[in-house]
Amino acid sequence: MTSDPVFTFCIVSDGHVNPEEDVSSSPWNSNRMANGRNRYVVHMLNQLKPDFVIHLGDLIHPVPSLPSYATAARLFHEIFKPLNCPLHLLPGNHDIGDKPSSWTPAEIVNDPFMRQFETHFGSTYSSFDFDDCHFVLLNSQLLNSGLQAEKDQAAWLAGDLEQNRNKRIFMFCHYPPFITSPDEPEHYDNLSEPGRSWLMELIDRYRVKALFSGHVHNYFYNRSNDTDFFVLPSITFFRHDYSELFKVGPAEEFGRNDLGRFGIFWVKIYKTHHAVHCMRTEGSTIKANTGEPLPEIQTHGFHPREISWSGLGIDMRYPWAEIIEMPYSGGLDEFYRKKARNDHPLCAMWEMGVKKLRLPIHDLLDPQVRDRVSALKQMGHTFYLFMYDIPSSRMIDILKQHADLIESLEIIIPWKSPETFLKPLKAIRDTVNLPIFLSKLQSSADAEKEGGRFKHFIKHGFQPSETGVIREYLSLKGATEAIDGFVFRIGRLSDPLTEIHRLSKEMTTLGKKTQFLVTLAKENPALCEEDDHTIADRVAEASTVAFSLPDTSIFIDTFIDMDRGYFPRHGLVDRRSNPRRAAHVYRQLNTILGPHSENLNIEGIETVGSGKCISLKSPGFAWILILPETEMDLSRLEIQALNDHLDSSPGTLFNLVSGERSGVQLDGSSQGPLAAEKKHHEFIIADPSLLCFVL
């Protein structure tokens, strides 16, 4: 179970409020929607009920030299007036001018611009305490300006940090010090020298817990020494030059109105750590003075830092720490190919609460990726490596040096002469001090031929039918001492629920552990699996069995869509890391079943229409997961496992895609809008002793 946070706060950035409704000085329609999107964010903040909110700047869109600045400022205050908690404001470059540079596209920061901001919004830098934490709001545009205000802020900051050095310190500014590396060259989206190094030295000296910045309208996470560095997305529009990070065509407005890129941060402060949730807004808007019903905000989910259970892991097929050079665009950067990393897959993983990541060993060999592994380890992730054949001496050295980053090593071998690998496997196990799991190579060269047909494939993992092969292997002298367990591949023709439990139990009787790779691809490499309902069912089964076997590592393949090449299929998220149906199901099951995973048992499976029903129990709770293959009328749902609960009090119906909840009686009658309708969605029915999942 997780503990409650001591307090929470939210962070908003780059709202770009216009001086008029549905009118903007920018040529893009997304900018004209800014005011409505800001209103939606205020409504969202009120539902999250943070203790306070910090805005990182670009409060308004008109730059300081425009006569519409004051009008936009008044409208900003009008939009944020309904906010039910304190609001702390920082200036962005649209509010007081660009950072000091001879090439920036707008006027740079100066004293008149700052006085104008102070008139409408207050001080450009400040600090405050909350509980045992200290919050520092920095005017980043002042750095390198040469203004007297820069000297004043520097003296104030040095004294403020020293006075509060025994507190947990969090820092906030508009410009990020960097977006990829502390030593990266200057560009439009970072701080220049010497101000950057000055700030980084202070951050290191006072062991700042996290620094949050905006400006880039994109999501980035980095870690330098003991500090987390976050860059926030905008609530209004995406900086479409960063569409280059995605290896698919741009979204609407050539990427600027990419709805999955908008969001706010909801930060939970615990006694010993913090967890940062990126809450998507999807570009939602609320019109002024319409009186229309306001939508309910769904807040269910855990960050990996918040949970003790692991759940279902994911196989990381795509490069996930790759640094990409982006073309100079002519809009903001014209002299340098800016480098950036696509952190949106990471954002999606944290949104789902994924902890376990399966990586090829070559990720650990790359210093850049290895640093990323180390950073994410601090965020609660665990890493499981795999490789083909016996590792080289260089690989063994790396494994020994960084064994603290790794949970286990899977070694895949050809099965023609497995006895020849016994001594090398034993030597590796003794040397690297890691659990070693053995996996079998499966390829088209060894497969049975279908008449005159031949299809190329390379797979790995023992098939569920090959336990006899394993028993024969373990009968070899020295085999038991050479490895800790075996890896099974659960292909599309195998049932994850029954096979994983059966194989885990059988291997336990042999004194060996198991790992499983559950695939989503079809068996034919030319056919695409794009049935999101079928995929969600499979992810639901794999998640459920993972919670019931907390000491067994189970991974799902695939995380991100494979939309080209062999075995094309949908994953949990699309190529822009927007969640598909399966990602929502994963997140909801992780939230509801995860806290009970230490004592969760699968009690039975029954047929329901053309689908199945899985009964689960833990002390004080019972669950029923229903996986129909077609639409079903929930008001006529007949499940044998419900018979013991027909006299129970009304439960709650959960939609595992939207997170929506409503009351429901166990005989199928509903107190809300969902149960009596035909649905092809994911649901849960719950009371204090019963939860029923309906997919």
What spans do the regions from the language model cover?
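Aromatic- and carboxylate-lined catalytic core of secreted/periplasmic carbohydrate-active enzymes
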Residues: F265-W266, H273-C278, H300-F302, A540-E631
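Active-site clefts of carbohydrate-active enzymes
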Residues: P182, H240, L245, L438-H456, ...
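C-terminal beta-strand-rich structural cap/linker in extracellular carbohydrate-active enzymes
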Residues: Q665-L695
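N-terminal active-site segment of His-dependent metallophosphoesterases
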Residues: M1-P67
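Extended active-site neighborhood of metal-dependent phosphoesterases/phosphodiesterases
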Residues: W28, P64-N164, R168, D189-A210, ...
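Catalytic domains of carbohydrate-active enzymes, especially glycoside hydrolases
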Residues: V41-I54, Y336-L365, A375, M379-F386, ...
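Catalytic-core region of carbohydrate-active enzymes that cleave or remodel glycosidic bonds
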Residues: S475-D561, N643-L646
